[in-house]
Amino acid sequence: MSQWGSGAILVQPDSLGRGYDGDWHTAVATRGGGVVQLNLVNRRAVAFMPKVSGDSGWAVGRVSLDLRMAMPADFCAIIHAPALASPGHHVILGLIDSGYRGTVMAVVVAPKRTREFAPGTLRVDVTFLDILATPPALTEPISLRQFPQLAPPPPTGAGIREDPWLEGALGAPSVTTALPARRRGRSLVYAGELTPVQTEHGDGVREAIAFLPKREEDAGFDIVVRRPVTVPANGTTVVQPSLRMLHADAGPAACYVLGRSSLNARGLLVVPTRWLPGHVCAFVVYNLTGVPVTLEAGAKVAQLLVAGADALPWIPPDNFHGTKALRNYPRGVPDSTAEPRNPPLLVFTNEFDAEAPPSERGTGGFGSTGI
């Protein structure tokens, strides 16, 4: 990798290493703001063997892109559909870490009886994005004296509680730490864990960490739930992992909540959304499995990607409609106009194993997370 410079991205279509014409036609494109993409379209019929097929009419499966990549630590790859949506099926937005060395997979949702994609009908884009390693700036814990309704339930309580701000209880304009008191059109489950504490300012709460620290090779910060959350069959649940808000003066960075490859492949889709400053984090989990699924306490359910302010303009804020998990992103939104900090150089190679730098992650999992 060093011979190409620190900003190089190594790419090896599997067909290069095997000496044959592969299943995918791959082209390089430069989008607005200097963003670099790979545009893939299947040149042959591609088999589709779904692992999840409930009674929703949809099947979920993984499709190999016959591609391996090695990126600098300050880059990730976004797997998504092209702007022109393919008819009848959906490429679920995915996130690839810089340390992943295995074959890249796309998670595809297709009509239940689909078993292959005819030549030229499956199109997938890989967008390379420079990211920030700085964790998001969050507000301080909330005082129980100000908001006694946030006191955690007794140990014998009923478990998950609906977030109280949906009822407008925290909308007092005179309190600077009040959560946004606007409705989002559906119920929302607070999945954090609160512990009462004594502080120099009086009674308060300590909230368990909802956004885990990330390693150098990780693209995003894992988002965990601290209580069990059940997503109904063929339905949705809006999850709020923390009571903390993103600081209003968070700077030029933008925070995006994206799904995890392992959950996407199981038919539990996180609707991509942008987390706006001054708001709490909330996102939709859409269950296509046909049976209720419980996310256990401590489960990693989504990822928080911190990037430039205009990095992903096609991911809207407050994206709280479950069916939008099946939307092909991007659609109808102009390209980014922000210049990447370090525009990447794509290098195609047939000596990937020899030229790619070592990685802690290796070939584990199939993209952003392990299975």
UniProtKB/Swiss-Prot annotation:
<feature type="binding site">
    <location>
        <begin position="260"/>
        <end position="262"/>
    </location>
    <ligand>
        <name>substrate</name>
    </ligand>
</feature>
<protein>
    <recommendedName>
        <fullName>Deoxyuridine 5'-triphosphate nucleotidohydrolase</fullName>
        <ecNumber>3.6.1.23</ecNumber>
    </recommendedName>
</protein>
<feature type="compositionally biased region" description="Gly residues">
    <location>
        <begin position="362"/>
        <end position="371"/>
    </location>
</feature>
<dbReference type="GO" id="GO:0046080">
    <property type="term" value="P:dUTP metabolic process"/>
</dbReference>
<dbReference type="GO" id="GO:0004170">
    <property type="term" value="F:dUTP diphosphatase activity"/>
</dbReference>
<feature type="region of interest" description="Disordered">
    <location>
        <begin position="350"/>
        <end position="371"/>
    </location>
</feature>
<comment type="similarity">
    <text>Belongs to the dUTPase family.</text>
</comment>
<keyword id="KW-0378">Hydrolase</keyword>
<dbReference type="InterPro" id="IPR034745">
    <property type="entry name" value="HSV_DUT"/>
</dbReference>
<dbReference type="Pfam" id="PF00692">
    <property type="entry name" value="dUTPase"/>
</dbReference>
<keyword id="KW-0460">Magnesium</keyword>
<comment type="function">
    <text>Involved in nucleotide metabolism: produces dUMP, the immediate precursor of thymidine nucleotides and decreases the intracellular concentration of dUTP to avoid uracil incorporation into viral DNA.</text>
</comment>
<feature type="binding site">
    <location>
        <begin position="366"/>
        <end position="367"/>
    </location>
    <ligand>
        <name>substrate</name>
    </ligand>
</feature>
<dbReference type="InterPro" id="IPR029054">
    <property type="entry name" value="dUTPase-like"/>
</dbReference>
<dbReference type="InterPro" id="IPR036157">
    <property type="entry name" value="dUTPase-like_sf"/>
</dbReference>
<keyword id="KW-0479">Metal-binding</keyword>
<dbReference type="GO" id="GO:0046872">
    <property type="term" value="F:metal ion binding"/>
</dbReference>
<keyword id="KW-0546">Nucleotide metabolism</keyword>
